[in-house]
A protein has these predicted regions:
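Extended accessory and catalytic-adjacent subdomains in large enzymes
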Residues: 1-152
Length: 152
């Protein structure tokens, strides 16, 4: 259930030394953080866009194209649900379709957070092609994060 998943995303992202208390549907639980902010961002983008896990895991390092509203940033939509960019993803199931979707500022913000995380935590992989990288055995960031690496 998507509500439960979203309620527990902070546990996935929190450092392993942290303890979090999550209340969902009237039930309170305490968890230790799992320390995987990349996986949390993958899940969140997946929930907000409806794209497949593999499509999110294989996003290019710079997958966004901002929508030009013709009058500069101030003339863009103030509605948080308005589309502000196109997200280019890896289409692996269907041939002959445009592999882009319109996304809101919430998705743009998550992608910008991941780009900042990448710069801070994986500067050795700065030239790698993927936004989400395999966490182990991938010093140069040439391999995308696999579904298996965050599903377990």
């Amino acid at each position: 259930e998507i509500g439960r998943l979203l309620a527990h995303l902070p546990v996935l992202a929190a450092p392993t030394r942290d303890t979090l208390t999550i209340e969902h549907e009237g039930v309170t639980h305490t968890y230790h953080g799992l320390g995987d902010s990349q996986a949390a961002r993958i899940w969140e983008i997946q929930a907000l866009t409806g794209r497949r896990a593999s499509e999110i895991c294989m996003l290019d390092r710079h997958p966004l194209t901002r929508i030009d509203f013709g009058g500069g940033p101030a003339s863009g939509p103030a509605d948080p649900d308005a589309f502000v960019a196109r997200l280019r993803y890896q289409q692996t199931k269907v041939d002959g379709v445009d592999p882009t979707i319109l996304v809101t500022q919430a998705v743009v913000t998550i992608i910008e957070e991941q780009q900042a995380w990448f710069t801070e935590h994986r500067p050795d992989a700065a030239d790698g092609p993927y936004l989400f990288v395999q966490p182990r055995g991938n010093a140069r960031g040439l391999n995308p994060r696999t579904y298996r690496s965050y599903a377990d």
